[in-house]
């Protein structure tokens, strides 16, 4: 699973500055979907090849009554759930009583902790940081978060233990060729292999929207404790099941509540668990309460699922028992506020009575198949050429932008890499046109599709392809399926 990094410290030591710097690479993705809000406390970051969830825990006001009462419950929860804690201090202000109390709490939790002395720009950093060694948490790492100094080195060092285990691609490796080219026959065989794997389905949403009720309806038994009170699911529950010959792993996540409404520490843990479940899933099923409409929390969860590139299905629950006027208003609100995700199927269901639940799986399978479908290089290049024939790229400085070659750059979500001349100058309107053209041509439903543009000629032309070990294993699996099919 993707690691979680918690930023801990007293107020005004630079936690939010570091959070914004780490997560800003994802802002552009969110901006691609107008009307979408994001949760400023939880973010998905990508730095130096490492991908992780970063949590800004908020500050601690004082120490008079002890760390347990002064640290926000959300901060306690984040520390418990985090894989790595960055304990941030202010090198200019020096060591404070609050720093000592926080350090005492962190030592008692035995978490992997790194002391960060922030704001070292313009001062004698070594002298200013010396006193922080007395915290008893090991080495003190110098940083100037506002300028980005020391940030990359800190993250690389903190997350090194997760690199090999998680198969993280380090920056500098060629991400474009990470997914090898498929022939038509190999793509078909690989798709068949993927259809035999269980679909990991994360059911997410605010508390009390009916996630556990829906899980029980799907399973046909009381597998998840359900009470008519928000937050009764304490942890993400992984439940294997089979339906009409297809295997699934249902991930029933604890509800995400507004921070102002969360009073029990155990319930706050569920926020991070939900975000980690999204990362672990193939398909995300977002449940919305028909009686409450679309809340900001719904949009925040939606944004995280989109940023993670997960296939998506939306279910509007509790559709039974409301009058037609309310139904019309809900549908109008969905059209107005969720028009930017027109690729996702929307279902109106009653988890309690089972109305419409069966049709969910048609969309879930459709979304999974679209997100993981292997497409040959020749097919992608043909579609690219057809899009040019139907609508030529614009002129740039009197020269026509020329698209030469397309190939797959990744899956779940599908990524198409397009090579050509002056592609960096293509207007957003033409990029959207091409994205929609690929979506229609490939019949991609239920998943975002990403286009990446690279300058230059076909990088594979007149070049012998050297496969990585993982690519070689995938090639052998595809060839094995082809042989098995031919012998039958």
Swiss-Prot record:
- Enumerate the UniProt keywords alphabetically: GTP-binding, Nucleotide-binding, Repeat, Ribosome biogenesis
Name the cystine pairs.
none
Where does the record place Basic residues bias? Answer: 473-488
Q: What Gene Ontology molecular-function terms does this entry list? A: GTP binding; ribosome binding
By its UniProt entry, which Gene3D superfamilies does this protein fall under?
3.30.300.20, P-loop containing nucleotide triphosphate hydrolases (3.40.50.300)
The entry marks the following residues as binding GTP 2, namely 205-212, 252-256, 317-320
Q: Where is the KH-like domain?
A: 373-457
Q: What Pfam families does UniProt report for this protein, alphabetically? A: KH_dom-like, MMR_HSR1
Q: Which InterPro entries match?
A: G_ENGA, GTP-bd, GTPase_Der, KH_dom-like, KH_dom-like_a/b, P-loop_NTPase, Small_GTP-bd
- Region annotation (Disordered) maps to 460-488
GO terms of biological process kind = ribosome biogenesis
- For the ligand (GTP 1), the binding residues are 9-16, 56-60, 118-121
Q: Which domain of life is it from?
A: Bacteria
Show where the EngA-type G domain sits: 3-166, 199-372
**HAMAP family to which the protein is assigned, alphabetical:** GTPase_Der
Per the entry, what this protein does is: GTPase that plays an essential role in the late steps of ribosome biogenesis.
PANTHER family per record: GTPASE DER
NCBIfam families in UniProt? GTPase_EngA, small_GTP
Q: Record's family?
A: Belongs to the TRAFAC class TrmE-Era-EngA-EngB-Septin-like GTPase superfamily. EngA (Der) GTPase family.
- Please describe the quaternary structure of this protein: Associates with the 50S ribosomal subunit.
Q: What's the protein here called? A: GTPase Der
């Amino acid at each position: 699973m993707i690691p979680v990094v918690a930023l801990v410290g007293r107020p005004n030591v630079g936690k939010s500055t570091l959070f914004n710097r780490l997560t800003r690479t994802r802002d552009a993705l969110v901006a691609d979907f107008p009307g979408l809000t994001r949760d400023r406390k939880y973010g998905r970051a990508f730095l130096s090849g490492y991908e992780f969830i970063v949590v800004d825990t908020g500050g601690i006001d004082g120490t008079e009554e002890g760390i347990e009462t002064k640290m926000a419950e959300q901060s306690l929860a984040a520390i418990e759930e985090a894989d790595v804690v960055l304990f941030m201090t202010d090198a200019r202000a020096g060591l404070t009583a609050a720093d000592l109390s926080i350090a005492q709490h962190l030592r008692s939790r035995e978490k992997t902790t790194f002391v960060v002395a922030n704001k070292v720009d313009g001062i004698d950093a070594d002298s200013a940081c010396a006193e922080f060694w007395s915290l008893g948490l090991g080495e003190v790492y110098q940083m100037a978060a506002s300028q980005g100094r020391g940030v990359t080195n800190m993250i690389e060092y903190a997350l090194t233990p997760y690199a090999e285990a998680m198969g993280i691609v380090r920056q500098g490796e060629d991400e474009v060729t990470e997914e090898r080219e498929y022939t038509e026959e190999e793509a078909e065989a690989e798709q068949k292999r993927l259809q035999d794997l269980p679909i990991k389905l994360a059911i997410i949403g605010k508390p009390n929207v009916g996630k556990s009720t829906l899980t029980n309806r799907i399973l046909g038994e009381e597998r998840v404790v359900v009470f008519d009170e928000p937050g009764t699911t304490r942890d993400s529950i992984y439940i294997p099941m089979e339906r009409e010959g297809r295997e699934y792993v249902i991930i029933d996540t604890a509800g995400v509540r507004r921070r102002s409404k969360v009073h029990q520490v155990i319930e706050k843990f569920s926020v991070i668990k939900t975000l980690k479940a999204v990362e672990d899933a193939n398909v995300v099923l977002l449940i919305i309460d028909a009686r409450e409409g679309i809340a900001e929390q719904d949009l925040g969860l939606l944004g995280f699922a989109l940023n993670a590139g997960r296939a998506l299905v939306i279910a509007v629950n509790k559709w039974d028992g409301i009058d037609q006027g309310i139904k019309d208003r809900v549908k109008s609100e969905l059209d107005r506020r969720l028009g930017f995700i027109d690729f996702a199927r929307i279902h109106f269901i009653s988890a309690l009575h089972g109305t419409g639940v069966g049709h969910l799986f048609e969309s879930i399978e459709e979304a999974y198949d679209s997100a993981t479908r292997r497409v040959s290089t020749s097919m992608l290049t043909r579609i690219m050429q057809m899009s040019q024939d139907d609508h030529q790229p614009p002129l740039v400085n009197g020269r026509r932008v020329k698209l030469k070659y397309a190939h797959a750059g990744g899956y779940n979500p599908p990524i198409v890499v397009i090579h050509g001349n002056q592609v960096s100058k293509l207007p957003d309107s033409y990029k959207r046109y091409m994205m929609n053209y690929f979506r229609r041509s490939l019949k991609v439903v239920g998943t975002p599709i990403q286009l990446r543009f690279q300058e230059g000629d076909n990088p594979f032309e007149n070049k012998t392809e050297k496969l990585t070990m993982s690519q070689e294993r995938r090639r052998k699996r595809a060839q094995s399926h082809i042989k098995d099919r031919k012998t039958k």
